[in-house]
């Protein structure tokens, strides 16, 4: 398409219509102009039939009852559960699907969500997941794959969509989330980074007004989005208002930050129904696409007529959308993509992600792995079958699933696997208990407790243990985010967290249980001992107002500053082997901090370790977290071997955001670098010295009276200069008593010309 020619032929009305969704998940087709339809779809875990079928095949669904249509959507690959009439609808839809999928007859894949990808700490694994997601989207003619990724910080563990995000830490977010973008974009499909910004709750999500400090936005909530802005084609605005302004109508977010500060040149689409004000206000703010359709263009035309929206601004938005359509609306499947390759590519990516992200959290007396010939009894009504995905936009209906119990039967023998067999447990069989918690978009969890069923099972097994049962208890956490164990940690022997592991989760879990795979996942989020310990506990809203009262102290930052011990800390994950960080050295070169670390595998099994380096500012002039993740690496080390690991990060990463100055500032002085296998397991430290600070922080006229009072030589020099100038020292005494944070220049504007004072300040900085 010659977009410049097409654009010049478009009327103002057509440009307005171009911005407005035509259906729930597509933009309007203009046949006479040669503009094709652009399809959107969720998402980050695979193809969502609940969105796809009504958007593409509503004419078929209308011939059946809503219940029949819903059954076909959710049971498309469970035909034995369908009535004859529902099977008829299924066949009609399958026929339509075959016309776009060609020789791809397999079901869509279900991939792990962000929280499990975050637990991999492996950028390459996340990238390969993005490639598989992009391949799937091509097969369904999806031009923009929504939620690739969801970068919202894991702030509130009860959030119904917590599982979609990657981490509570901005650095881990910033390294991993862009890799989904890269993978999807490499296939030609447009990735979509959402929800910008602070979509951290489901309660009152449409219309809630969140008060968030600028420092918290800049240091915690923006970095993941900023990293994605360099590689993603589209952004999605969020539901909440931030500091009084709707995210979809915020010029600060969508223009000043996203475009002016970060240089984003792509297209912004609203979250579905997020634009609750005037469409023209959102266009002026920097938003281009309005969903879902059919979206009314009338208000845009009225704004053009009354002058509240300029034709130039409309042109800017329409051209951005037209360019996106030209690039992504007419994508074709690769000609060499066979059904077998489609399955193999997806299965491999999903398996690697699950294998890399599943976390071993407890392993008392080496209870795991389960040895060949052992007996296993699986307890619970779900019979060990995993929930692969969360509810809402992230749900995927497929028959490409794997089963942990069935795989264990293959590995250990069918005769060694039983269900709910307490007698076998008495005789020494492993008791495997799966705790599954369902979570979904639209509502938050009520608490962080395990289900009553699981607590009762563990209670019964614990009682049997006290009465002489010889078996070991393994608890599997099939969860959307943190849970509290309420004392179960004293009963169980092994604990594995699989989150929602995707379609290959059953296989990956069985491989880890039996030692075919050495677990290497590390938690991307802190697990509290009690919900009341969480940093955001007191800020959970009961209205349409929410204050992020914890500020920058999100996740492990909040636990450390309050000296609260969590159940499992950020970055924590065990292995079937053991590792020792034996040395760390660091130097500052050309604006980079270069680190060399030596890590050894001191066990008898090859495995992967996640080495993490945190920084701690020694003697800071502002309140800062106790430690902040700066860099990390996941490395494989053979048993009995050691490996040199090179890591680095920018000196600018050490900056903090000053609300007084409206910018990031760098403190000079000493920073301790802490290397460990989690945020709490610090093995080695070293110190670097940053020799130059930001001009705004140089000791001198802009320093507070309080800080000056703590520098005796500087204070004496000031007194002498004031005496020579015939000025009183009394203003300093008064300031120190009542407003000690005032800058010295506020009370002595001429101090910049005081030679003794300025020389003493320079010497103080050097010393």
What are these regions (language model features)?
Residues 568, 685-688, 718:
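Generic detector of short, aliphatic-rich beta-strand segments that form the cores of beta-sheets
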Residues 693-766:
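Compact, charge-rich alpha-helical regulatory domains located at protein termini
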């Amino acid at each position: 398409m010659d977009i410049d020619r097409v654009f010049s032929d478009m009327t103002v009305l057509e440009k307005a219509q171009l911005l407005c969704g035509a259906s729930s998940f597509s933009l309007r087709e203009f046949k006479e102009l040669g503009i094709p339809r652009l399809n959107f779809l969720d998402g980050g875990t695979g193809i969502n039939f609940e969105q796809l079928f009504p958007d593409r095949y509503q004419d078929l669904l209308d011939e059946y009852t809503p219940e029949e249509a819903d059954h076909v959507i959710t049971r498309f690959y469970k035909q034995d559960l369908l009535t004859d009439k529902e099977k008829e609808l299924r066949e009609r839809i399958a026929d339509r699907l075959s016309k776009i999928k060609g020789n791809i007859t397999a079901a869509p894949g279900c991939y792990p969500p962000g929280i499990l990808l975050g637990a991999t700490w492996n950028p390459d694994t996340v990238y390969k997941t993005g490639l598989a997601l992009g391949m799937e989207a091509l097969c369904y003619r999806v031009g923009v794959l929504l939620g690739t990724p969801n970068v919202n910080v894991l702030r509130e563990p009860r959030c119904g969509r917590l599982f979609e995000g990657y981490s509570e830490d901005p650095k881990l977010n910033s390294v991993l989330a862009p890799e989904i973008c890269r993978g999807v974009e490499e296939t030609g499909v447009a990735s979509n980074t959402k929800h910008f910004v602070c979509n951290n709750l489901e309660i009152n999500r449409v219309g809630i007004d969140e008060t968030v400090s600028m420092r918290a936005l800049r240091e915690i909530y923006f970095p993941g989005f900023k990293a994605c802005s360099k590689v993603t084609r589209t952004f999605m605005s969020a539901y909440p208002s931030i500091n009084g302004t709707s995210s979809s109508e915020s010029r600060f977010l969508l223009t000043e930050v996203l475009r002016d500060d970060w240089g984003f040149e792509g297209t912004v689409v609203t979250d579905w129904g997020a634009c609750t004000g005037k469409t023209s206000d959102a266009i002026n703010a920097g938003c281009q696409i309005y969903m879902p359709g059919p979206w009314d263009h009338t208000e845009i035309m009225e704004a053009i007529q009354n002058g509240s929206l300029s034709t130039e601004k409309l042109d800017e938005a329409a051209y951005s959308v037209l360019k996106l359509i030209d690039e992504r609306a007419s994508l074709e499947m690769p000609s060499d993509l066979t059904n077998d390759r489609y399955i193999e590519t997806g299965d491999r990516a999903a398996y690697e992600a699950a294998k890399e992200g599943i976390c071993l959290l407890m392993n008392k007396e080496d209870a795991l792995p389960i040895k060949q010939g052992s007996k296993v009894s699986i307890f619970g009504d779900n019979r060990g079958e995993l929930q692969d995905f969360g509810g809402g936009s992230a749900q995927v209906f497929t028959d490409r699933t794997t089963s942990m119990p069935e795989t264990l039967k293959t590995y250990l023998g069918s005769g060694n696997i039983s269900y709910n067999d307490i007698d076998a447990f008495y005789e020494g069989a492993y008791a495997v208990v799966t705790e599954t918690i369902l979570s979904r978009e639209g509502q938050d969890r009520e608490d962080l407790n395990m289900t009553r069923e699981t607590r009762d099972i563990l209670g019964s097994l614990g009682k049997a243990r006290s009465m002489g049962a010889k078996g070991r208890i393994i608890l599997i956490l099939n969860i959307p985010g943190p849970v509290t164990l309420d004392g179960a940690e004293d009963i169980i022997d092994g604990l594995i967290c699989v989150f929602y592991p995707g379609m290959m989760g059953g296989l990956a879990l069985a491989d880890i249980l039996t030692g075919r795979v050495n677990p290497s996942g590390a938690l991307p989020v802190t697990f509290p001992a009690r919900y009341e310990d969480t940093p955001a506990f007191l800020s959970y809203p009961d209205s349409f107002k929410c204050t992020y009262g914890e500020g920058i102290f999100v996740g492990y930052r909040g636990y450390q500053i309050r000296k609260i011990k969590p159940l499992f800390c950020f970055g924590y994950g065990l292995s079937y082997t053991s590792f020792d960080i034996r040395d760390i050295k660091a130097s500052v070169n050309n604006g980079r901090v270069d680190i060399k670390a030596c890590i050894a595998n001191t066990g008898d099994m090859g495995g992967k370790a996640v080495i993490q380096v945190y920084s701690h500012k020694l003697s800071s002039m502002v309140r800062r977290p106790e430690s902040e993740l700066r860099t990390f690496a996941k490395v494989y080390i053979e048993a009995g071997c050691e490996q040199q690991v090179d890591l680095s990060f920018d000196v600018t990463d050490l900056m903090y955001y000053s609300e007084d100055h409206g910018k990031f500032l760098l403190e000079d002085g000493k920073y301790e670098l802490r290397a460990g296998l989690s945020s709490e397991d610090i093995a080695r430290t070293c110190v670097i010295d940053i020799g130059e600070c930001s001009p705004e922080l140089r000791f001198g006229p802009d320093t507070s009276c309080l800080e000056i009072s703590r520098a005796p030589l500087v204070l004496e020099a000031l007194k002498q200069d004031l005496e020579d100038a015939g000025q009183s020292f009394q203003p300093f005494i008064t300031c120190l008593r009542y407003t000690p944070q005032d800058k010295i220049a506020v009370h002595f504007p001429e101090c910049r010309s005081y030679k003794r004072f300025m020389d003493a300040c320079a010497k103080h900085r050097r010393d």
